[in-house]
From Swiss-Prot:
InterPro entries per the UniProt record, alphabetical: Maturin
Start and end residues of each stretch annotated as Disordered: 107-131
Designated gene of the protein: MTURN
GO biological process: negative regulation of NF-kappaB transcription factor activity; positive regulation of ERK1 and ERK2 cascade; positive regulation of JNK cascade; positive regulation of megakaryocyte differentiation; regulation of signaling
One Pfam match: DUF4581
Cell location: Cytoplasm
Record GO cellular component, one term: cytoplasm
Induction of the gene: Up-regulated by NF-kappa-B RELA/p65. Up-regulated during 12-O-tetradecanoyl phorbol-acetate (TPA)-induced megakaryocytic differentiation of K562 and HEL cells.
Name under which the protein is recorded: Maturin
Sequence positions bearing Phosphotyrosine: 34
Keyword set, alphabetical order: Cytoplasm, Developmental protein, Phosphoprotein
Amino acid sequence: MDFQQLADVAEKWCSNTPFELIATEETERRMDFYADPGVSFYVLCPDNGCGDNFHVWSESEDCLPFLQLAQDYISSCGKKTLHEVLEKVFKSFRPLLGLPDADDDAFEEYSADVEEEEPEADHPQMGVSQQ
């Protein structure tokens, strides 16, 4: 996929997230993204026909630790698309953006109807002597 097509994918992705594509550099194949409050990162796109993966990084010390999830994902087996990489970055930055963690939402919905049962008093608990 040529760089302009990748930039189009990035623009479309931005329309569904708080991020803006603030700069593109075709010679470096770099795209810079920004969202309030000061969340920024960039993506280096692999050359056509090259075996390299995408690379994500941030020049912000506050943002960099949150990118670990996305970096691990990119380095895992299999080719990733730009959209997949950007989605993983968005998920990584949700806490910085003040958004709930997507996984937490699913877990809360699933466990919301579960009622805790009180242990019955007439059954002895294991390991507790009855005297």
